[in-house]
Each structure stands twice: as C-alpha cells, then as structure tokens.
Amino acid sequence: MKRNFDDFKQFIKCKKIGVVGIGISNKPLIDFLLKLGARVSAFDKKSPDEIGEVARELKEKNVDLVLGEKYLNDLSDFDIIFKTPSMRIDSPAFVKAKEKGAYITSEMEEFIRYCPAKIYGVTGSDGKTTTTTLMYNILKKQGYKSWIGGNIGTPLFSEVEEITPDDRVVIELSSFQLMTMNISPEVAVITNVSPNHLDIHKDMEEYIMAKKNIFKYQSNSDLLVLNKDNELTNSMTGEALGKVRQFSIKEKLNKGGYLNKDSLCIDGDEVCKLSEIKLKGMHNVENLLAAFCALKDDVNIESMREIATTFSGVEHRCEFVREINGVKYYNDSIASSPTRTLAGLKAFEKPVILIAGGYDKKIPFDILAEEGYSKIKTLVLMGATKYKIKEAFENLELKKHVHIPIIMANSLVEAVNSARKVSCRGDVVTLSPACASFDMFANFEIRGNMFKEIVNDM
C-alpha cells in the first residue's frame, strides 16, 4: 500500500538518523534528510582522507561523521538507521540498534513505499541492467515521463516529490537490496536465478529467498514476470500473489513472451524478427522478452519494436572495443558469475580467447568448464580465483578428456598481452571474468574501462 510522502516528512522531522555508508546513493539521501529537518550522523569504514571532499562538505552541513575501522561500535540512540544494501541486517551492530528501538531501513525500501508512480522492479542473477534499461527506453518511447534507478541510474528517493502518479519508474534490485524488503513493486521481473553472491549470503536458499521478496508482498492485481526456461524461476509460479506472465526462448506460449522460429512475440503478436535486433546473444533475447512481458499492459507493439531494433546495449556488456590485425576485442566486464560468462560466450559463433578470473564469491566454476569448454579456444586466467577456475577445467579434462589451453596471468595488462600473443586473424578476445572485480578493481566499470584502455593503446 503506497503512503503519502507528507507522512514521511512528519515522521522524519527532528528525528535522530544514522546513515551507514557514504556512497553513491547515500550522499543525496543525507542531503535530502537534512532538507527535511532531520538530525543526521553518517558512518563509514573509510578514513577522512579516503572520503576526501565529501567529508568536508558533510561537516559544513553539521553532519556528525563516524569514520574508520570501528565506525559501527556505537549505533545506539538513533530513531532511524538507513543501511547500505550490502550490509547484513543480522550484523551485531544492527541487532543491538534494533533492540534499542531503532527503525532500520534503506533508501530503496522507503522509495518504493512512498513513490506515487507505478514501479517496475527487475531482479535476477544475470540480465538485470539490460532488462531494466530496455524497459526504461520502451516506456520513454511510449511517451511516459520515466525514471530509472536502484542499482543503476541516480538515487531516486531524493527525487520522490518530483514524481507524479502518471510517471513510470523502473528499478534494478539486487539480492542485497531485497533481503530486508517488506514491500514489493506493482510489476516484478525475475530474469533468472543461479548461484551468486554466496560470499555474502549464508547459502543458496537465503539468496533465493531474497529474490522472492520482489513479489512476496504484491497484491492480487500486481504482475510477476518469470523465466519459464529457468528451473528456479519457473518453480515460483505457484507462489505468486497476483498475475503471472512468463517468457521462453525454448517453447511457444499461449500467453507471454516467446521466440517463434525467428520472431520475438508477445501474446501471439510478433514484435520483431531475430535478425532485426542489435543485441548479441540469446540471453539478450530473453532480456527483450522479459521487458515485453513486463510492459505489455502499458505500451504498444510499435514502442517495443522501435527499441528492440535500435537498442545496441549497455556499456561493459558484450561491448565491442576494437579490431586489431583481424582480432576483435570485446568488453564483457559485467559478467561476474559463471552463468553470465556462459551467456556471453554463446553470443559468439566460434570459440574465443577468454580472459577470466577475479574476486571469489564462493561459487563453483564447474558449470563454466562443463558447459563452456566448446566455446573457448584458449583460457587466460587472472585474479584471486585463477587457480580455482584452472582446477575446474583440469577436472573436466580428467572426466571428459577435453583439453583447453590455459595461460596464467598476474594482472589485467599481462592477461590482455598474453591473449594478443596467442591470437590470430579471425579470433575474438573477450574479457568475461565470471567473477566480481573487488580483488583488483573497485568495481566492474573500472575493470572494463581499464581493459578498453589497454586494448586501445595496443
């Protein structure tokens, strides 16, 4: 049930608020809370030097700063605490604060609660950003004033008073954001579910339960969009509280989105031909079908077709960088899981030179070896997981007698140079790490941009 934002303004006024994490979304949140008359303290593990100019700005606004390794030692005596998404609600500091009466929430939870416009929420292990961006563009093409946020775009809560009931909002939601949510968007999309983020979640069951929160609190008039081809998402149909619309690239559906030979269809109507779309790979066909299903009630076929046949993708997602001496280089830095890397590999017509490896999210790489070996010509490994991935391919060789040449590298520069040395005219080199970036880079964007710099400097 949507609430009037005036209620929040009354609720927040003169309250003592703690904001944990001074990041991309929380800086605008702090400014917004101050504007509404709250007393704000900001907490972050970083030192004043690491935060830099932002720390000085916040102090000038009379925000109390608690910084450094012991920043969570005292969260007591706060009325409300806004936490950063990746922090677990069951951490001792939050448990203690809750016991003392604090209301613990997040920027995105409060946005969904008070946003007056229809919200389309998108989650999944892979394909979230592309699907979210497609939906945003289709809605804009239809003529709606549209907003995009959550894991991508700009923080939205500070803009909530600018949004009207006639607008449309598309948000990308991670499992971290969903873990503590007790409110769901009117339209919920789950692109797929496979093992991911098991470095943060206790186990796969907790990860799946977090994803389910996107529809757990829907009403009977709301919509849930699910991937029929994914075993885990298909099994969720019986748990839906509202309407369900599915999509499939494997079978024709009476209702929903599907691939019929070379046509992308929704509810029996052709949207466009497979040959007309610019996005590479069948995983992107799934993303398009998911977007069609989510928007079927609000847009026409023409708007879907226009975006489907002109949208060329989001940066760092199977992004063509350059061709050098007949070798094509692609940046797929977003691929932070084995399943996402597999989807990228399947977009190419022949085996590629794959650069992989990075931060260990505690997920297995057996699936990458067993389902990806036929798409890999040479494997160049780097980062914290390079030996773990190497072991998966060595096990494959023992089991199936399939040998994939493996090169070990100590940096991205070394990995790219190694890939170049073994490449020949007609080859494809792709950075598709199957891992997060945090062992070597602050985020996947920096990793992808460095890859592009290295390639463009060759």
UniProtKB/Swiss-Prot annotation:
It holds the Pfam family Mur_ligase_M. Its EC number is 6.3.2.9. It catalyses: UDP-N-acetyl-alpha-D-muramoyl-L-alanine + D-glutamate + ATP = UDP-N-acetyl-alpha-D-muramoyl-L-alanyl-D-glutamate + ADP + phosphate + H(+). The keyword Metal-binding does not apply. ATP binds at G124, S125, D126, G127, K128, T129, T130. GO terms for cellular component: cytoplasm. GO terms for biological process: cell division; cell wall organization; peptidoglycan biosynthetic process; regulation of cell shape. GO terms for molecular function: ATP binding; UDP-N-acetylmuramoylalanine-D-glutamate ligase activity. Its main location: cytoplasm. It is found in: Cytoplasm. Pathway: Cell wall biogenesis; peptidoglycan biosynthesis. It is an enzyme of class 6 (ligase). It comes from the Bacteria. Cell wall formation. Catalyzes the addition of glutamate to the nucleotide precursor UDP-N-acetylmuramoyl-L-alanine (UMA). NCBIfam families: murD. This is UDP-N-acetylmuramoylalanine--D-glutamate ligase.
